[in-house]
């Protein structure tokens, strides 16, 4: 049996479609009620959770495989996993965004950067050898520059429509984001053949 955790919401819907295209039994997922975990005819046991919970399940060996966004992986310090598959799901970017004149400003203090992703933000500016003040926001991060709380933001950008609607723009792309299929290293050691078979089936389903 392979135990899997899938991020709830859009990723769940898109991964379900991918599993279906790979000829896996998705009937229990499509008919999901209040069950906390389900089993399929393919000997898969699946649970659904919030992004950080998927990481926690994997970290503690509760599941073998996780489907989770690269943004969540980058923001966590868990690294005891292998990244098996780059899925064409939830594609977007991490970006530094601000007003158009941001790059030309001479700051007499540390730049204030608003973000839901302090770890990603800290790493990005550390690579640029810049000391900054990180302001953690949980809601609309774009409000940071708009209300004068921050000079710029680090956030996920998909279409850029929200940025442009508020007079902001992408200053620099940080990295590409998409859903990733990851496996606990210990699980891969003991269930390698079954896991590789699953990866190959999903790869074929992505390209067909």
Curated annotation (Swiss-Prot):
EC number: 2.4.2.17
Pathway, per record: Amino-acid biosynthesis; L-histidine biosynthesis; L-histidine from 5-phospho-alpha-D-ribose 1-diphosphate: step 1/9
Main location: cytoplasm
tRNA processing keyword on record: no
GO cellular component terms listed in the entry, alphabetical order: cytoplasm
Recorded catalytic activity of this chain's protein: 1-(5-phospho-beta-D-ribosyl)-ATP + diphosphate = 5-phospho-alpha-D-ribose 1-diphosphate + ATP
Enzyme class: transferase
PROSITE patterns, A to Z: ATP_P_PHORIBOSYLTR
Subunit structure comment from the entry: Heterooctamer composed of four HisG and four HisZ subunits.
Misc. comment: The stability and homogeneity of the HisG-HisZ complex is apparently increased by ATP and 5-phosphoribose 1-diphosphate but decreased in the presence of the regulatory inhibitor histidine.
Protein name stated in the entry: ATP phosphoribosyltransferase
């Amino acid at each position: 049996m392979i135990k899997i955790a899938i991020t709830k919401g859009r990723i769940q819907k898109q991964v379900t479609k991918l599993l279906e295209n790979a000829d896996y039994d998705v009937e229990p997922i499509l008919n999901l009620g209040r069950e906390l975990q389900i089993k399929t005819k393919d000997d898969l046991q699946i649970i659904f959770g919030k992004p950080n919970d998927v990481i926690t399940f994997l970290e503690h060996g509760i599941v073998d495989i996780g489907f989770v966004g690269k943004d969540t992986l980058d923001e966590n310090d868990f690294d005891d996993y292998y990244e098996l598959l780059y899925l064409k799901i939830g594609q977007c970017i991490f970006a530094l965004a601000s007003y158009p004149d941001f790059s030309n400003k001479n700051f007499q203090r540390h730049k204030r950067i608003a973000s839901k992703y302090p770890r990603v933000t800290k790493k990005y500016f550390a690579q640029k050898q810049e000391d900054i003040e990180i302001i953690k926001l949980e809601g609309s991060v774009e409000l940071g520059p708009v209300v004068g709380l921050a000079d710029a933001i680090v956030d996920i950008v998909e279409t850029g429509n929200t940025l442009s609607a508020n007079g902001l723009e992408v200053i620099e792309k940080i990295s590409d984001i998409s859903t990733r299929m990851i496996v606990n290293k210990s699980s891969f050691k003991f269930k390698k053949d079954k896991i590789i078979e699953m990866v190959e089936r999903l790869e074929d389903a992505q390209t067909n």
